[in-house]
Amino acid sequence: MLMEVKKIKFSYQDKPFIEELSVKFKKNKITSIIGPNGSGKSTLLMLLSRIYKAKDGTITLNDKNVWDYKIKEFAKNVAVVHQKNQIYGDLDVKTIVGYGRLPYLSYHQNLSEEDYQIIDWAIATTNLKEYENRLLANLSGGQQQRVWLAMALAQKTPILLLDEPTTYLDVKYQIEILK
């Protein structure tokens, strides 16, 4: 098992939102969280990715509390694509996808040949090769979503947390992503 949530509680402005939630995410399994708008799916992703911290309960990764990991070590295990990404608009696709390799670099270390191969693989996997030198701001919403997916894939993590990963994508790409 990779990730486990045990009896977590989370509140927004002292109003209980998630109460006593427990769930296990097993290795080599795809787990989908389905529910109506406002039911806490994105909040759970924020908790799993350490953006929010649960009021009570624990979230473990390989039997270790997620908060006990250093940021880079956590990022080597968990990649996240959020529902809304509004940053890096003035950077090109290849640079943004390359940010997925940052957890593996030391301060001021350059990308290796292996890193560039992984970046090229992530770009090809998400069908972005023809856009790799374009600025993110000049891409459609669906193309931008694929850039975020490529960046997460470039992290080469055992866990991918995807919040509405097919938003803005054409049906063709929705099917490919879900495969």
Where would I find each of the regions flagged by the language model?
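Conserved ABC ATPase "signature" region
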Residues: G98, E113-Y131, K156
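Catalytic Walker B motif of ABC-type/P-loop ATPase nucleotide-binding domains
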Residues: L160-E164
